[in-house]
Amino acid sequence: MAADLCWLSLLLASLALSGAVYEDQVGKFDWRQEYVGRIKFASLESGLGAKKLIAVTDKNIIAALNSRTGDLLWRHVDKDTSEGTVDALMMIGQDAITVSGGRLLRSWETNIGALNWEAALEPGSFQAVSFAGSQDTARYVAVLKNSALSLYFLSNGHLKWSESLPESDTVQYQLLYSPYKGSVHVVGLVPHSHLTILTFSLEDGSISHQVRVLTPWLRTLHGTCGVIGEGVLVCGDVPMASVHIVSLLSGEETTRYSVQSLDIELAEDPTQLDVITAPQNGIGGSLSQFFLQIAPRRFLLMHYHDGVLTPLRDFSQVSLVNFATTGEKTVVAVMQCKTEGNPKSGAESEYLTGQNCAQEPWYCPGHTYSINLYMADSGRRLLETTMSFTLDQICVRPDSFYLQTFLRKDDSVGYRALVQTEDNQLLFLQQPGKLIWLREESLADVVTMETVDLPLTGAQAELEGEFGKKADGLIGMVLKRLSSQLILLQSWSAHLWKMFCDARKPRSQIRNEINVDTLARDDFNLQKMMVMVTASGKLFGIESSSGSILWKFYLHGVHPGSSFKLLVQRTTAHFPHPPQCTLLVKDKVTEKSAMYVFNPIFGKLSQLAPPPLQRPILQSLLLPIMDNDYAKVLLLLDDQHKVIAFPATKYVLQQLQELHSTIFFYLVDVEKGKLSGLRLNKDLSTEEIWEVLLPADQQRITVVKGKRSNEHVHSQGRVMGDRSVLYKYLNPNLLVLVTESTDTHPERCFIGIYLIDGVTGRIIHSSVQRRARGPVQIIHSENWVVYQYWNSKARRNELTVLELYEGTEQYNSTNFSSLDRPLLPHVLQQSYIFPSAIRAMQATITERGITSRHILIGLPSGAILSLPKALLDPRRPEIPNEYTREENLIPYTPDIQIHAERFINYNQTISRMRGIYTAPSGLESTCLVVAYGLDLYQTRVYPSKQFDVLKDDYDYILISSVLIGLVFATMITKRLAQVKLLNRAWR
C-alpha cells in the first residue's frame, strides 16, 4: 500500500510540473506551412494503392510527401552548405540511398524517415553512384570518385573494397554501369582523344578488363552519352550529325550511325544530339530504347538491338519526356503543348504588361499541356492515357515531371503525374487531368515581404464617407447617417442568420472560404494581406489569419540571386483609390533594373505605367509627400546619379522643387569601402556633399541599416529615479554601418560599428569589437541599437546594446534637424552573453509605440525567443541603489538565459529561419509576427499583455448572471425596504 501511494505521489508531482499550450489555443491565431524547395530528384511509389513520394530538393532536403494529399510525412534538413548538397538519389524497395556533399553515403527507411546506416566516402570529387550485384540481385552500392572506385554493402554500409583508378590525373572518370553479373564498369574520358573502359570484379576489386577506344569527337559524357541495353554506350556527335555506339563489355571500336541515314526528315542539320536514357532498374537491366533530342522541342524515340539502330517514333513540339515502368511494362511519357484553343484573355491580359515571353521558342499559347503514354518497345500510343492540364500563370513552362504508374484490373496502364514548373510549383495530377493537390515550393525561399491593411466593406466605406463632407448640410448628413445605419443593420442581420444556419450544421460542413471578393477589415485590424516576394521572382498575396494564398504572379526572366525591394506607396486608407505597391528588381546577371506596380489586394498590375528604367538603379527613397491620388512619391537614383520620380506628375515635380534641399540619398560602395551622401537639386540631379572612406584592404562593409519608416515613438524621454528626465536622441536620419575585418584569423579579426548621420555624414559614434567576427545580426530602432556577434577570444555569442541620449535637457523639442545639432549625444553601451547562435532578429512594433518593446530572436533550433528589451538596457546597474530601484531597473548580470516559456512558437519550429517581420495591428497591445525560412509561421505577440481587449476565456455567462442577479436583488431589496418603512410609519 505504501509503495502504491509513493508511485501515486510521484505521478501527481510529474503532472504538476508538466506544462503545455492549451488545446484550444493551438492554431487559433497562428499557423505554420512547411515546404521543401525545388525538387532535384524524385521517386514515386508504383502501384494502385501507392501513397508515398520521395523527393530531394535544392535546399539539401530529403523528404516524403503523401501522394494523396500533398502533406509532408517527414523531412530531413541537411547543412545549408555544399557539404549538405544531395548529389544522387536511388530507390530500392522501401530504402532510399543518397550521397550528400560527395562525403556521406546514407540509407533511409522511407516509411518513417529513419536513417538505416551512414558511411563516409573516400576523398575526391563525386561522379556517380550505382547498385551492383550478381545474379540480377543488388547487394552492393558502387561509388565513383574522380580517382577511386569504392564498393559498399547495401545491407549495412560497410566498405568492401576501394581501388584507385589508373591515370586519374589525365582521365576524367564520369560514368558508372553495373550489369549485375559480378562486375562493374567505369568509363573515363580524355576530351577529344579517347575513352578508357575499366571492368572491376565485385569480389576483390581487381581490374579484369581494360580497353581504350578512340573518340576524338567526344568532349564530355554528361548529357551527351548514356548506357542502354546490355552495357551499350550511346553518344551523340553534333558536328558530324551522327550517333556513336560502343559496347562496354567487349570494348570494340565505335560504330557510327548518321542521322541522315535513319530515314528522318530534317530541314537542317540538328542543333543538338542529347541522349536521354531510362534509369537502371533494380535487377540490373537497362532498356534498349532511348530518346535522341535533335532540337529544343523535337525528340526521337530510338531502339538499338543486335547492331541495328531504329527510330520508333518522332515527337515534335515536345516540352518534356520521361520513362516509367510498372510490372513488366515500360512506357515513355511525352509532354506536349496543346495547341487547340485560343490563348487566354480577359483577366490575364492585365498581367501581360512587362511580360515578353510570347517570342520564346518554348511559349505555349493557352498554357495547356497534354501528357501521353507510348509503349517503349514499339512507340505505339496507348489509348485513354491522355492527361491535360492548364497552368494558372503565363510565361511559365513545365520544368520536370515524374510518373506514378500502376496496372488496372484489365491489365491497362494507369498513371498519375507530378509536374514541377519553372516557378517551383508542384502539381499532382490524375487522369484525365484532375488536379489532386498543389504546392507552392517557391515560398521556401522568401526574400522580402510587406503587409497591407485590408479594405473596408461597403457598409464601413459608407460610414466613413459621412465624415469630412460638410457641403451636404445638416439634413443631408442626417439622411446619410440613417442610410448607413440601415446598411449596417442589414449586414448584422445577415451575419446573425449565417451564425444561426451554421449552428445547425455539423462542424465539418461549415465553410469559411476566404477569397479576394469577401476580404474585409476586421474590427481590430488583425487580419491583413501579406505580400511576399520569393527568390524565383514569384509574388504571393496571402491572407494572414489563415495562410490562404489568394493570388500569385510570376515575373518571367528573373535570374537567381537578383535583389528585390518591395514598397507600399498607397494603403487602403484612401478609399476609393486602390492600394498600390511597387516592386523593384535588380537582375544579378545583367544588372538592369525593372519596376512593377500592382494592387496588393487583388494581385493585378496597376493601370499606371511605371517609368522605363534605362540605367541600373543604385538607391530608392520613398518620400512622405503624396501626389493628388494619395500615392507616396518614389525617387530612384541611377548609376549616373540622376533621379527618376514616380509618379512624375506636375504637382509632384512642383513639390520636389520646393523641398529639394531637404532630400538626401546615401550610397554604399563595398569594393572601395565608401559611404557617400548626395543632395537633390531642382533639376532632379544630385551632388555629393560628404563621404566616409574606410580602408577596404582591412575591413569590408557588410550592413548599412536605418530606422523603419512606420515606427512611432510615444515618449521622448525616460523618467529617472530622481524625477529628472533623460531625453532620447531621436535622429530619423541615423545610419548604422557594420564592418568586418578582411583578416579572418581569430586573434586579428574584428567588427566595427559606426553611427553616421545620413544628412551631414557626421560620425556620431564608433566602436570596434576586437577578436570578434560575424555574421552580425542588428536591430536599429528609436534611440537604441542591438547587435549580435561571435567573440573569438571567449568563443561565445554576445549581444551588445547601444542607447543614445541628449541628456537631461532637450536641445529642440519641436523639430529635429541634423544641420543644427552642435553637441554629440551620450552613448551608453553594455554587452551580454547569449548562449546560442542567432539566425534572425527583429523588434516588435505597435500602432502608437506605447507598448513595451520585445526583441524577437530566431534560433538555429527553429524557435523564436521573445526577449524583453528591459533585459537589454545599458543602464542596468551592477549594484542597485534607491534611484535604480525606483526606475525598476534589473540588476546587471552578464548572461541572458533562454527560458522555454519565452518561445512564441512552442513546437512549431521554423527550419533555416532567414527573417522575422513584425507589423502593428489595430490593437495597441498586439503585434503581428511572421517568420520565414524553409517554413512560414504567423502569430501574434502581446509584449505588455492584452490590456485593451477582453481575453478569449472571459466568462460572459457568469458576469451576466451576476449582474442580472444583482439587479433583481436590488429590486427586491428596494421593495422590502419600502414595506419596512411603511410598517414603521403605521406604528
UniProtKB/Swiss-Prot annotation:
It is a single-pass type I membrane protein. Disulfide bonds join 225-235, 337-364. One of its GO terms (biological process) is protein insertion into ER membrane by stop-transfer membrane-anchor sequence. The keyword Disulfide bond applies. Residues 978-987 are cytoplasmic. It is found in: Endoplasmic reticulum membrane. Glycans are attached at residues 812, 815, 907. Residues 22-956 are lumenal. SUPFAM superfamilies: Quinoprotein alcohol dehydrogenase-like. One of its GO terms (cellular component) is EMC complex. It holds the Pfam family EMC1_C. Its main location: endoplasmic reticulum. The chain crosses the membrane at residues 957-977. The keyword Membrane applies. Residues 1-21 form the signal peptide. Keywords: Disulfide bond, Endoplasmic reticulum, Glycoprotein, Membrane, Signal, Transmembrane, Transmembrane helix. Component of the ER membrane protein complex (EMC). Belongs to the EMC1 family. This is ER membrane protein complex subunit 1.
